[in-house]
């Protein structure tokens, strides 16, 4: 599921990204400079982004399961592009629902 999320993120497939976030007011996403609470708020934010997502290289990915219905995915990445080699971190908490695995909490930030 993480690979599907990553492909949607890099490809800016908003429909898949919206699908993979739990459709709940309890879902949250802490971004680089913003906080979003609830699936609807996250969806509005995502719709405001440019159509092309910045390229990135995954440096390290750690996926850990806790039982059969709960997991975390943590990534260290490097932004690609003209003179931009920032190192970032992304954390996701995944929960298995009746619809499948969904992100219930996410955080993304850069290392200063």
Language-model segments: which ranges?
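Short, surface-exposed beta-strand-loop junctions and turns on beta-sheet-rich folds
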Residues: 36, 79-80, 109-110
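A short gly/proline-enriched turn/hairpin at secondary-structure junctions
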Residues: 26-37, 47-52
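Short, well-ordered alpha-helical segments enriched in acidic and aromatic residues
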Residues: 11-26
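Short, aromatic-enriched amphipathic alpha-helices that serve as compact interaction elements
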Residues: 1-12
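Short, well-ordered beta-strand segments in beta-rich or mixed alpha/beta enzyme
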Residues: 20-21, 28-30, 70-80, 91-93
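Short beta-strand edge/turn micro-motifs at domain boundaries
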Residues: 87-112
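Surface-exposed, charged secondary-structure patches
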Residues: 41-84
């Amino acid at each position: 599921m993480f690979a599907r999320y990553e492909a949607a993120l890099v490809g800016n497939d908003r429909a898949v990204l919206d699908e993979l976030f739990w459709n709940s007011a309890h879902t949250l996403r802490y971004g680089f400079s913003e906080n979003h609470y609830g699936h609807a708020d996250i969806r509005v934010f995502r719709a405001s982004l440019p159509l092309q997502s910045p390229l990135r290289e995954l440096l390290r990915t750690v996926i850990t399961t806790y039982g059969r219905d709960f997991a975390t995915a943590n990534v260290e990445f490097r932004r690609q592009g003209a003179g931009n080699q920032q190192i970032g971190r992304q954390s996701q908490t995944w929960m298995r629902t009746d619809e499948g695995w969904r992100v219930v909490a996410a955080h993304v930030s850069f290392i200063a």
